[in-house]
């Protein structure tokens, strides 16, 4: 199969086809065709499937929309922009932060919220994903928020199954986690002392299996960050990552020196088929975010982590709970970003339908 998927061929592709791709190449096969199904002809968002294919102005519009949900004191506000609409959360993978913040965001927007119990759904009885979605669509859903272990699942839904329902990607396999990427951008926008164009960002951890890393790198580059550094053992780096314009380090101390932002990543043990690390203690010794390593960064550097954290493996507790950590702010910002994406996607979907599509 070629290194890109023509959107015209997508109706014959299922999530199981995407899932067999290696994490070294999955992004190449999906990203080229992401922009077409998720945007209206005027550039407005009607699905949110990935950051790839969106330009700087579109990402800035999402950030600005998220900012509008904070009051003058920095507190989140309610705004009934989805009153009368129904959102269904379809999480085929376990989640705490993402699912909960989506639900909070939906309720703050005034939506009717339904959490589908996948473990008790008909998919566990052999029903196909396509049939499950068509049945849920018949129940007058307006938005599906989906997390799935198959890379490309959200794209599959938006193009083949339910094009008239706004699809929000809550994470798909190895491929992408776009709302996490955008909440990270909102956090940097709100907390960093310099604009994106002047920042040096270090991303540390399991890059190879991380959908967060893929979304963060894409968003950072689109927003103008020129100095993006990645650091991991060779076994946790995707092949050819250098072609994405990032600087690759194996020495953690060198990677974080004079940087403005340190992003830690979780070791994706559930996605690793065979042991790729000698031990957790060995990993922490060479790649853990410790006070000593944070001290090598700029004095006002931010420390970030998408969670869940493995303390004493990826990050020291004193750093996670320290003054430079913005990890809990990331969680709060996640509500605002998800409110923004839900609102913008529904607005775009309404415009798409009004145009007679």
UniProtKB/Swiss-Prot annotation:
User: What residues bind L-aspartate, as annotated?
Assistant: 125, 211, 266
Pfam families, sorted? OTCace (PF00185), OTCace_N (PF02729)
Enzyme Commission number: 2.1.3.2
Q: Identify the enzyme class.
A: transferase
Pathway noted in the entry: Pyrimidine metabolism; UMP biosynthesis via de novo pathway; (S)-dihydroorotate from bicarbonate: step 2/3
Name which cysteines form disulfide bonds.
none
Lipid metabolism recorded as keyword: no
* Gene Ontology cellular component annotations, sorted alphabetically: cytosol
Residue segments, region Disordered = 1-21
Annotated residues that bind carbamoyl phosphate are located at: 97-98, 147, 177, 180, 307-308
**Known catalytic reactions:** carbamoyl phosphate + L-aspartate = N-carbamoyl-L-aspartate + phosphate + H(+)
Provide any one GO MF term from the record: aspartate carbamoyltransferase activity
Write the record's keywords in alphabetical order, separated by commas.
Pyrimidine biosynthesis, Transferase
Residue ranges, compositional bias (Polar residues): 1-15
Q: Which PANTHER family match?
A: ASPARTATE CARBAMOYLTRANSFERASE, ORNITHINE CARBAMOYLTRANSFERASE, MITOCHONDRIAL
Per the entry, what this protein does is: Catalyzes the condensation of carbamoyl phosphate and aspartate to form carbamoyl aspartate and inorganic phosphate, the committed step in the de novo pyrimidine nucleotide biosynthesis pathway.
**NCBIfam families per record:** asp_carb_tr (TIGR00670), PRK00856.1 (NF002032)
Subunit structure as annotated in this protein's UniProt entry: Heterododecamer (2C3:3R2) of six catalytic PyrB chains organized as two trimers (C3), and six regulatory PyrI chains organized as three dimers (R2).
Q: Which family does it belong to?
A: Belongs to the aspartate/ornithine carbamoyltransferase superfamily. ATCase family.
Q: What is this protein called?
A: Aspartate carbamoyltransferase catalytic subunit
Species: Psychrobacter cryohalolentis (strain ATCC BAA-1226 / DSM 17306 / VKM B-2378 / K5)
Q: Which gene encodes it?
A: pyrB
